From Swiss-Prot:
Gene Ontology CC annotation, any one: mitochondrial intermembrane space
N-acetylalanine modified-residue sites: 1
Keyword Heme applies: yes
Protein name: Cytochrome c
Gene3D superfamilies, alphabetized: Cytochrome c-like domain
Free-text description of this protein's post-translational modifications in UniProt: Binds 1 heme c group covalently per subunit. It is not sure whether methylation is on Lys-80 or Lys-81.
Task of the protein: Electron carrier protein. The oxidized form of the cytochrome c heme group can accept an electron from the heme group of the cytochrome c1 subunit of cytochrome reductase. Cytochrome c then transfers this electron to the cytochrome oxidase complex, the final protein carrier in the mitochondrial electron-transport chain.
Claim: 4Fe-4S is one of the keywords in the record: no
Molecular-function GO terms, alphabetical: electron transfer activity; heme binding; metal ion binding
Protein family according to the UniProt entry: Belongs to the cytochrome c family.
Xref: PANTHER family: CYTOCHROME C
């Protein structure tokens, strides 16, 4: 299923998911540093592997995907399948609602 078929995302629910599953490795605020994973500020419309100052895997750089709702929706289902060789150890979010919620939160928090 694609993002266009996903349920509407809930930003508040997405924030909870981010805190539980993503914040250990990622920040969203402008100017916040990289952690184990890159800072996600300005994520939408950015090509994978291009946040300045973060050491990406070759796989992430070479994938050259542009992050939008639809690409994030597919990626977050199974990151290792979407970008084989990625350093991201997160197994993914299987539930469409969880992915839609997280994307709604990221859309606001990284802008």
């Amino acid at each position: 299923a694609t993002f266009s078929z996903a349920p509407p995302g809930b930003z508040k629910a997405g924030q909870k998911i981010f805190k539980l599953k993503c914040a250990q490795c990622h920040t969203v605020e402008k100017g916040a540093g990289h952690k184990q994973g890159p800072n996600l500020n300005g994520l939408f419309g950015r090509q994978s592997g291009t946040a300045a100052g973060y050491s990406y895997s070759a796989a992430n750089k070479n994938m050259a995907v542009v992050w939008z709702z639809b690409t994030l929706y597919d990626y977050l289902l199974n990151p290792k399948k979407y970008i084989p060789g990625t350093k991201m150890v997160f197994p993914g979010l299987k539930k469409p609602q969880d992915r839609a919620d997280l994307i709604a939160y990221l859309k606001e928090s990284t802008a």
